[in-house]
Amino acid sequence: MSGGLDVLQMKEEDVLKFLAAGTHLGGTNLDFQMEQYIYKRKSDGIYIINLKRTWEKLLLAARAIVAIENPADVSVISSRNTGQRAVLKFAAATGATPIAGRFTPGTFTNQIQAAFREPRLLVVTDPRADHQPLTEASYVNIPTIALCNTDSPLRYVDIAIPCNNKGAHSVGLMWWMLAREVLRMRGTISREHPWEVMPDLYFYRDPEEIEKEEQAAAEKAVTKEEFQTEWTAPAPEFTAPPQPEVADWSEGVQVPSVPIQQFPTEDWSAQPATEDWSAAPTAQATEWVGTTTEWS
């Protein structure tokens, strides 16, 4: 499919991306029309997709998208959550028209409704989940491209790209690869330099996980500010006292003599004797003692 050109051949880094995202892992079921894209079957029943065929169909789909003069006439659709972010990113990069979320029935056939569209090409994420736009595209003769798993039905699909369309990383990587090839064929980016956009931007992220990450980051920032106010106060400048210069260490350092100040002292033996503590108790003490006779 690549015509034997080295420029269009799959690179090693592309294969590593496919393997890391699990693009080659299909399902346990196999549609008879997808048998041509299967490489082997694992012992646990999972079919392995031939990545060489995946790359060839990816280039064919990119050529079909580039052939449309107006990029807005290409509709990219994903009703599943795992492909909605990728569809929006693909549309922003290539200028296509995205439909993320529920597809309104009659969008391609009912001319009365406000959401009516007449695209020239349709790209869907899952033929099983996006069966409604595929069916309507068959009514109005719109060519279709689909990311197909091993068990995906190929009815009304003109160009099937075999891949794992269930995993979030695999779907995001396939849309990223498709957008990169479209931009390369248009001449927007060069094949000699890597694309500055990372595949991570096309991956689906759970909103609950995003909220947890934001809360954790906020708590970490608060604790960091508290520690900074407590521990990062400016420390007083410490200057070491000058050391005396000693030429000969055997002589030692001479301690300067300090005059001792004389304080007046008193003769404690000359003072008069204090009271006799053995004398009789005071009257107040006798009164307290007298009151205690009642308790006896």
UniProtKB/Swiss-Prot annotation:
Residues 161-180, 205-229, 243-296 are annotated as: Laminin-binding. PROSITE patterns: RIBOSOMAL_S2_1 (PS00962), RIBOSOMAL_S2_2 (PS00963). It is found in: Cell membrane; Cytoplasm; Nucleus. The record marks 115-116, 133-134 as: Cleavage. The keyword Chaperone does not apply. InterPro entries: Ribosomal_uS2, Ribosomal_uS2_C, Ribosomal_uS2_CS, Ribosomal_uS2_euk, Ribosomal_uS2_euk/arc, Ribosomal_uS2_flav_dom_sf, Ribosomal_uS2_vert. This is Small ribosomal subunit protein uS2. It comes from Gallus gallus. The gene is RPSA.
